[in-house]
């Protein structure tokens, strides 16, 4: 569990008056321009008061004019990222965006 979330926890659970943000896992592609994908998900989750975690499915080369390249990660790498978050931090909600390939969706 990240230090920011660990700090609020005591032996009986969450400390009196401590508000733990919802833990949101965003599964999506990475947009190099920051206008969409994981980058936009992190911004939105943070503004809404959540704790953002990510599993990157693909890396894109894009800007305001369009997408020029996409490179999907392996399903094993995506699964490893998801497991790393779920097994340690826990997840309250999942947001799914671009999966990158049919193999990742399977």
Residue spans for each PLM region:
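Short linear motifs centered on Gly/Pro in flexible linkers and helix caps
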Residues: 6-7, 27
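Small-residue (G/A/S/T)-rich helix-start motifs and N-terminal tracts that mark the onset
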Residues: 14-93
């Amino acid at each position: 569990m990240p230090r920011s979330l660990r700090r609020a926890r005591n032996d009986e659970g969450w400390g009196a008056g401590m508000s733990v943000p919802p833990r949101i896992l965003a599964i999506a592609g990475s947009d190099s321009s920051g206008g969409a994908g994981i980058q936009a998900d992190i911004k939105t989750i943070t503004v809404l008061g959540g704790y953002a975690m990510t599993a990157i499915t693909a890396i894109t080369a894009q800007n305001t004019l369009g997408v020029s390249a996409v490179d999907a990660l392996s399903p094993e790498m995506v699964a490893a990222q998801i497991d790393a978050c779920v097994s340690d931090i826990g997840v309250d909600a999942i947001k799914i965006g671009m999966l990158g390939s049919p193999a990742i969706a399977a």
